Amino acid sequence: MRSDAIKKGHLRAPNRSLLRACGLKDEDFDKPFIGVANSYIDIIPGHYFLNDYAKIIKDEIRKNGCVPFEFNTIGVDDGIAMGHEGMLYSLPSRELIANSIETVMNAHQLDALICIPNCDKITPGMLMGALRVNVPTIFVSGGPMASGVTKKGEKISLSSVFEAVGAYESKKISEEEFKDIECSACPSGGSCSGMFTANSMNTLCEAMGIALEGNGTILALSKEREELLRKAARRICEIALDERFKIRNIITQKAVRNAMVVDMAMGGSSNTVLHMLAISREAGVALDIKDLNFISSKVAHIAKIAPSLNSVYMDDIHKAGGVSAVMAEISSRQGHILELDALTITGESLKERLKNAKIKDENIIRKVDNAYSKVGGLAILFGNLAKQGCVIKTAGIIGERKFKGKAVCFNSQDEAIKGIIKGKVQKGNVCVIRYEGPKGGPGMQEMLSPTSLLMGMGLGADVALITDGRFSGATRGLSVGHISPEAAEGGLIGLLKDGDEIEIDVDAYTIHANVSEEEIAKRKKEFALPQKEVSSRWLRMYQKLVSNASKGAVLDME
C-alpha cells in the first residue's frame, strides 16, 4: 500500500503514535487509507450541506473495510463574488484548490481519494490536484438545486436575478416583481439549477467516467443523491489498491474527447474550455483549443438548458434520461465521435455503461434528427482580434450569428457596468471590455453583470460583447470571451478605439477588427500599457505566473 510509508515498520512508530491519537487501532494499520476531499463552506449554497455528505461517505468507507481521512479545500462562490473585487480571486482559487489536494494527499501518502466538489472552480481544481497525485479516485458532487418558481408560476434560476437587475434599472419590472425574482430563484441548497459552470463540470466528470451515472443531474439533498454517495464510497473501497483505476488511467485522451463531445451536445459553460485545457495539461493529454471546432462540427446540440432555454433545468435533464441518454443518442447517431471503449470508474467501458440508456422525454433531450443545431454549443473564433483564439457559447446566442458593429471600449468591468447603465452602449454596438484577462485583471473576472444588464435592458439580441475576461455559465447572448492574446500582453483588443468596426461570424469561426495594418502599427507605437496597482501579494504572484486563456490560464513555471 502507498500508505505503508506512514504506518509500517519500527521506523514509523512516531507516525503511528500520532495516528493513534486520531483514534486508529492496531487493525486499522492493515487497511487502505482513503482521503475524503471535502469542500464544505457555509457561504456557498451548493456546499453548506457537504459536511453531512462527508459523514455519509466516511461511514460507508468504514463499513467497507477502509479508513477515511477527511480534509477540506477552500471554495469561492462566483455568484456572491460577482460584480466587485472578489471576482479577482475566483479563477486563482482553482490553483489553490489543486495545490491543497496535492499537498494533503502526498504529505500523508493516502492510498485513494474521493472528492466532494460542487460549484464553480472547485470541481476543476480538485481534478487538477487529483491528477497530480494519481491514485484511484472517484468524484461525487453535491448536486444541483431545483429551479425556482415565481408567484406567476414562471421557472427561474440565478441568471434570472442578474437579468432582473437590468430590467429593474430600465424600469421594465416593478420593485415587487424584482423582489419576487430575488427571493424565488434559489429555493434550496445545491449548485445553481441551469447549465452553468458547476453543473457543466459535474456533467463532464460523468462523461469522462470519473464519476458514477447521475453525478451531474441528481438533485442535491435528495434520497437519490445520498444513495449515489454511498455507491461512490463503496466503489472507492473496492478499487483503492487497484492501479487500473488510478485517475490518469481514467482521464485519458479518450475521456477528454468524450467530455468535449458532451459539452458540445449539451451547450455547456464557456468556462469548460478553460478548465478542460488545464485538466488535460495535468493529465498529460494533448488538447489544443484549435481542436474544439472539429469536435463541435461533428456533434449535434441536442439538449438546451437554462440560461439558453429558460424552461429546462438540470432536474428536467435527469428525468429525461440524464447525461447517459445524451451520450447514448450521440453514440447511436454520431457514434464515431465518442470513444466508446474508454474505461469508466465502475470497470465498465463507456459502451457498457450506455447499453440501457435512452431518452425518456424528447422535448427535453432531442434526437439528433431534431437537434437544436447540427453543430455543438461552443465555438472557438480566430482573427486579428484573437490570433490565439477566443470562445463563444453558441447555445446562448439569441440573435444573429453574424454581427457587425461599432466598438464602445471600456478598460474594466466596473467601467463597463457604469457605462451600460448610463446608456453608452446602444443597439448595434460591440461592447469591448479589456484588461480583464488572466494577467490584466489579474484573475480573469466573469462578465455576468454586464451581459445580464444588457439582456435585462432589452439589448441582448442587438449588442455583442467581447472581452479578454470570461463569462459565467449563466451568460447568454452574443458574448465572446477569453480573447487571446489579452490586452495586458499586447493583444489587439487593447488597441481598439471607440468607433472601430468589428465583425463576428460564428459559423465562419472568425472575429475581426476592420482596422488597417498601418493603423494598427501606428497605434502600437503610441501605446502605453495602463498601470494597475495590485496590492495583493497572491494576485501579484498569480499575475506573474499565469498563462493566457488559450492555454487554460494555468500557472506556468517554465
UniProtKB/Swiss-Prot annotation:
Binding site for [2Fe-2S] cluster: 119, 192
GO molecular function terms attached to this record: 2 iron, 2 sulfur cluster binding; dihydroxy-acid dehydratase activity; magnesium ion binding
Pathway annotation: Amino-acid biosynthesis; L-isoleucine biosynthesis; L-isoleucine from 2-oxobutanoate: step 3/4; Amino-acid biosynthesis; L-valine biosynthesis; L-valine from pyruvate: step 3/4
Binding site for Mg(2+): 78, 120-121, 446
Disulfide bonds: none
Coiled-coil ranges per UniProt: none
Main EC class the enzyme belongs to: lyase
Catalytic activity, as annotated: (2R)-2,3-dihydroxy-3-methylbutanoate = 3-methyl-2-oxobutanoate + H2O; (2R,3R)-2,3-dihydroxy-3-methylpentanoate = (S)-3-methyl-2-oxopentanoate + H2O
Cofactor: [2Fe-2S] cluster; Mg(2+)
Keyword vocabulary terms for this entry: 2Fe-2S, Amino-acid biosynthesis, Branched-chain amino acid biosynthesis, Iron, Iron-sulfur, Lyase, Magnesium, Metal-binding
Keyword Magnesium carried by entry: yes
Residues bearing the modification N6-carboxylysine: 121
Cross-referenced InterPro entries: Dihydro-acid_dehy_C, DihydroxyA_deHydtase, DiOHA_6PGluconate_deHydtase_CS, ILV_EDD_C, ILV_EDD_N, IlvD/EDD_N
Cofactor note: Binds 1 [2Fe-2S] cluster per subunit. This cluster acts as a Lewis acid cofactor.
Any one Gene Ontology cellular component term annotated for this protein: cytosol
Free-text function comment from the UniProt entry: Functions in the biosynthesis of branched-chain amino acids. Catalyzes the dehydration of (2R,3R)-2,3-dihydroxy-3-methylpentanoate (2,3-dihydroxy-3-methylvalerate) into 2-oxo-3-methylpentanoate (2-oxo-3-methylvalerate) and of (2R)-2,3-dihydroxy-3-methylbutanoate (2,3-dihydroxyisovalerate) into 2-oxo-3-methylbutanoate (2-oxoisovalerate), the penultimate precursor to L-isoleucine and L-valine, respectively.
HAMAP family, sorted: IlvD
Quaternary organization: Homodimer.
Family, per entry: Belongs to the IlvD/Edd family.
Name of the protein in question: Dihydroxy-acid dehydratase
Taxonomy of the source species: Bacteria, Pseudomonadati, Campylobacterota, Epsilonproteobacteria, Campylobacterales
